[in-house]
Amino acid sequence: MLKQAGNQSFRPFISFAQKSLFNRQITGNHWIFARFKFYPLNKIVNYNHFHSSSCQSEAKNFYKQFEGDISDPPPKGPFDIDLGALKSSYLRKMKTLHPDVAQGKDAALAQRDSAELSKAYNTLKAPLTRAEYILQLQGINPVSEDISNSDPEFLMEIMDVHENISASRDSPEKLLQLSQENQGRKVQEINEIRKAMESSNWDSALLYVNRLRYWNTIDKILHDL
């Protein structure tokens, strides 16, 4: 549950947040304001989806693991994926890795391939992790954008949303409305990501990916109330 900071308004936190939060880049030590506390972004972002650049060349391309069943990533293919085809391909391939089927194959190797396939599936099925992975395929760190410099109005919008959540925490109806509004924001960001990636506008894509990550965090906060 959100906790009130005494009788103080949320507004006094803004100047402090701008100095201590929003003037830092979104890296492993970046902090995000949530539930009237500061949390490091690396506690929110699942870095297990990403490899270092040195490891990426050795890892299997997630899209190629489902080659022939889903389209190529942007800009060659669309951002959207046929989720039904992705799931069917995943389940079919997982069956071939089952110990009863993969006879003669090293058990450890089959287990590794199964883990890689699951990781690829879980990454590609969700818009945010898919977008982050596509950026990585382009050699772009998906959590490197400094939103504090590129989109200060967006940061103020986030602060307003947190304030609205705090004011509505005892009203299920208002919280539901805030959740629906946040879903609309996420759809809008995904639309912008789609347009940017399919036109090879990677700077814009990175900006909107980071915006979507913030709205996903708002989802988590609302879900936990």
UniProtKB/Swiss-Prot annotation:
Changing residue 99 to A: Inviable. Abolishes jac1 ATPase activator activity. Residues 1-49 form a transit peptide. GO terms for biological process: [2Fe-2S] cluster assembly; protein complex oligomerization. Residues 61-137 form the J domain. Disulfide bonds: none annotated. Signal peptide: none annotated. It is found in: Mitochondrion matrix. InterPro entries: HscB, HscB_C_sf, HscB_oligo_C, J_dom_sf. Disruption phenotype: Inviable. Keywords: Chaperone, Mitochondrion, Transit peptide. One of its GO terms (molecular function) is Hsp70 protein binding. It comes from the Eukaryota. A motif (HSP70 binding) lies at residues 98-100. GO terms for cellular component: mitochondrial matrix; mitochondrion. Changing residue 100 to A: Inviable. Abolishes jac1 ATPase activator activity. Interacts with ssc1. Co-chaperone required for the assembly of iron-sulfur (Fe/S) clusters in mitochondria. Stimulates the ATPase activity of the mitochondrial Hsp70 chaperone ssc1, to mediate the transfer of iron-sulfur clusters from isu1 to grx5. Belongs to the HscB family. This is J-type co-chaperone jac1, mitochondrial.
